Amino acid sequence: MKTLLLTLVVVTIVCLDLGYTMKCKICHFDTCRAGELKVCASGEKYCFKESWREARGTRIERGCAATCPKGSVYGLYVLCCTTDDCN
């Protein structure tokens, strides 16, 4: 009986964890002032914020990602995090 109860508890915990999805701010360039929250797709476990400087000033993009984007260009700064609304 104890084994059955323990098994049910473990299965419940695993099933509840599978249903979790991240919530990240999402915006592109000039719309980043508002910072609208988006429920990320299944498998997207990172929130990210990319920023870089241009002639018109600093540009920002925020969103969800399955893997943390890499800063491949000099001057591109990337922040990745794994909690809701962290970007």
Swiss-Prot record:
Main location: secreted
A Pfam family annotated for this UniProt entry: Toxin_cobra-type
InterPro entries, alphabetized: Snake_3FTx (IPR003571), Snake_toxin-like_sf (IPR045860), Snake_toxin_con_site (IPR018354), Toxin_cobra-type (IPR054131)
Tissue spec. comment: Expressed by the venom gland.
Keyword field contains Signal: yes
Cystine crosslinks: 24-47, 27-32, 40-64, 68-80, 81-86
Leader sequence residues: 1-21
Gene Ontology molecular functions: acetylcholine receptor inhibitor activity; ion channel regulator activity; toxin activity
Highest taxon above the source species: Eukaryota
GO CC aspect terms: extracellular region
UniProt keyword Signal, yes or no: yes
Protein's cellular compartments: Secreted
Keywords tagged on the record: Acetylcholine receptor inhibiting toxin, Disulfide bond, Ion channel impairing toxin, Neurotoxin, Postsynaptic neurotoxin, Secreted, Signal, Toxin
Transmembrane spans: none
Task performed by this protein: Inhibits carbachol-induced muscle contraction in a reversible manner.
Family designation: Belongs to the three-finger toxin family. Ancestral subfamily. Orphan group IV sub-subfamily.
Protein name: Long neurotoxin homolog
